[in-house]
Amino acid sequence: MSDFENSTPIKIKYDESSSLITDVFFKHVGNISAEPGGQIEFSSAPYERLSDLVENVTKGLKILEEAAAGELVFLSHGINPIAKENHPLVLPKERYQIMTRYFESAPHIRGVDMMRHSATVQANLDIFGDENWQDAVNLILVLVPLTQGLFANSRF
């Protein structure tokens, strides 16, 4: 049984100026939030098996798609293929406005593009315990290419 089935959304926040949901928390599962360019971020709880993560991400996407009721399109791309370079800031949070001003002062680093156009999967592989940390680090180094292969250009 999925964690989503045992969970009720217990916190929903939205930006009143845009009416966008900015944070949804599912107990024991993780957070679903919107990034400055409208990207969706899922910060999951830790999982022992990849299949459990995939199952819960799939169910989370279904919840988002149902909530969007056909009003939004979800793309599975690392970069927005249709946005113009001057893509407006979707979420008018103060921190994103501060970041925009900073990145615009250093256009050579393309920070505004990163904030508004890009999306990625960030996989965290944790080391449990200090006694065998060297073996754990070596295992993580072996798993990095596999992890990249699993998530490159993936819906997950």
Set out the residue ranges of the language-model regions.
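Internal, well-ordered domain-core segments that constitute the primary functional module
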Residues: 92-153
